[in-house]
Amino acid sequence: MISKSLAALVATAALFAASAGLAQPAGPAPTEGDFAIHDFHFQSGETLAELRIHYTTFGTPRRDAAGHVVNAVLIMHGTGGSGTNLADAPMFSGELFGPGQLLDASRYYLILPDDIGHGASSKPSDGMHARFPQYDYADMVEAEHRLVTEGLHVDHLRLVMGTSMGCMHTFMWGENWPTMMDALMPLACNAVQIAGRNRLWRDMEIDAIKSDPAWKGGDYTDEPLQALRTVSDITIIAGSAPQQMQKSMPTRDDADAYLAKALHRYMALTDANDELYAVASSRDYDPSARLGDIVAPLMWVNSADDFINPPELGLAEQQVKLIKQGTFVLLPIGPNTHGHGTHTWAIAWKDHLADLLAESGPKSAP
């Protein structure tokens, strides 16, 4: 998920999935909590007296004879999303977390954080507005690591995986703590500096917010609605899946009605500063120089209908060669792909997750 408009699209898809029979299977109930990090220092030089990181977990950590956790799985969301979004999405958790499924929550300890600026974690809309520290991906990954190690006392991860922004964070985890995990699964991203069209649409969203007089330098009382309307339009296109959209909106009236509903939902859910910060946080992402530091088996999955990571660039095919145990899979366009949002539809890629789990990590089941 890349922004709250895409998060809204995923939520809409979740409702569709539920009505189509993808009900959430019974399993352990989630536990939610908050981890406070005091005097958090950001890459920008700013500090926050207390950074709140919200999280959702399923299951119970299990330890080996030496006391190391053997069954923890870290799952990271996309820009504008949250761990709760993934936990509540039938096409994701409903395909993975239930009894007998690949990440059965009765066997694994599943950790789904809300990143800085997202969900119920500390964010600009809590009250600081544009005075909130200018966080970036390095800050977010550091906070994730401190949650896992200091907050939840997990010293080893069976699997690190993430969608979109979380996909990019997955590469950073593999580089920063290469021996901490048994396997990595980045879903829907590339491992280079964000440039070209991928940078352009982000710049367009940032400019739309900052150039709206109603934004008032971030100190608005009422949301800058024209800015949010433009951002919503851009992200709908960025997250588009032509075949799925044609199927679900076969007439002009269908398309017009969809746009109106998507815009209404987006405007109701979104704070402009939160959106601005979230989109801008990718500004210095570039793991390309350290891909060779990744030692855990890595299964990298993109889809051929992803507007944000277009397959014709061939970036992943070249980069995966730099990863010692890296495998790249490009999913062909089909009934189970949903553009960039394919990352949330586990039915499209869970067979590759099964392969990764079988080929990596402890040989005994958790």
Where are these regions (language model features)?
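Alpha/beta-hydrolase-fold enzymes
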Residues: 180-265
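Conserved acidic catalytic loop of the alpha/beta-hydrolase fold
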Residues: 138-158
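Active-site nucleophile elbow and catalytic-triad environment of alpha/beta-hydrolase enzymes
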Residues: 261, 274-290
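Short beta-strand/loop motif that positions the catalytic acidic residue
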Residues: 294, 300-302
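Conserved hydrolase catalytic core segment
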Residues: 155-196
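Catalytic active-site module of serine/aspartate enzymes centered on a nucleophile-bearing elbow/loop
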Residues: 325-366
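Conserved alpha/beta-hydrolase "acid-adjacent" motif
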Residues: 307-314
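N-terminal cap/lid subdomain of alpha/beta-hydrolase-fold enzymes
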Residues: 56-126
